[in-house]
Amino acid sequence: MRILLFAAAALSAVAAETALDRYIAKPDPAFTWKPVGAIPCQKCTATVLDMTSQTWRKPEEISRTTWQHWVTVIRPEKTVSDIALLFISGGANNGRPPQRADDMLAGIARECQVPVIELRMVPNQPVRFPGDTRDRTEDSIIAYTWD
């Protein structure tokens, strides 16, 4: 049994590189982040970051090429691990940072005693495609890109 587990682990370690692996590993000069400040959070420390994650498409293909996000890092008073839970959420790019930590996520951080990170504004929206007559959000963005 141990030999089988070792063989499976070895094979997974040498799995072929995919297009997604190459995309994620490719440096993007747009990537940056900076702390914005602390926000209220019961029995936790919550910090908001302003993060630019990537450049997506070219300016002639879409109205917003640079993806900007609000990231909230919630750290409970007592932690048992530095490994964090990551929650990816939606929202629109309206320019205002979060004013307080999400109560549910703060509760998870306290109960699990681990940091919790919320990455907002995925996908970045609204966006407009050339020749389109309206701004698109969420599934409408996905549907448009399938054409």
Residue ranges, per PLM feature:
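Boundary at the C-terminal end of the N-terminal hydrophobic targeting segment
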Residues: A13-E17
